[in-house]
């Protein structure tokens, strides 16, 4: 499954995540996202000693939630303006346990088996190659590591901003792609976070898995 398989036809580019408009987008991402970050961290079972990878971290709200729970965190995002904002907002307290790195899901700047938890929140619909991104996530997760993907639940046929997410069918396709990428126990479900209904995909790397 590539971005072309999404109902809106193509991956959403990152052009708007630049300059002043990028800062504005980053600020918008911080509004009302606390419940989403807490939900994903809870679904992933994040706790002290975990090494968390946040793919498409934006300004780092979910990364800071993981750090508050005692994890060390690597936030990866292709937009330099998001990384700068994330570093600024994470400069004190537990935020000092977060490292922000420029990169994309399809070529993660992370070593093999380096993390115990990986998640992608509202970012998979931006990926240019979903199977490649999932293979990369499998590569960087340690055996037994947990994966959570969370996207807004979209309606079939939605257009514009309403299509920024996954339909139930696309969530099922993403779970199947995760299984094909080597993950075990891949499945999809819906959750509520504040006013949002989310399509969530969860899986794990088998404790004795190859690769």
Summary of predicted features, one role per range:
Residues 106-117:
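A short acidic, Gly/Pro-enriched loop at the edge of an enzyme's catalytic core
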Residues 4-33, 146-202:
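C-terminal alpha-helical "lid/dimerization" subdomain adjacent to the S-adenosyl-L-methionine
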Residues 51-107:
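Class I SAM-dependent methyltransferase SAM/SAH-binding core
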Residues 30-50:
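Conserved alpha-helix/loop element of class I SAM-dependent methyltransferases that forms part
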Residues 51, 145-146:
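Short glycine-centered segments of the SAM/dcSAM-binding site in methyltransferase folds
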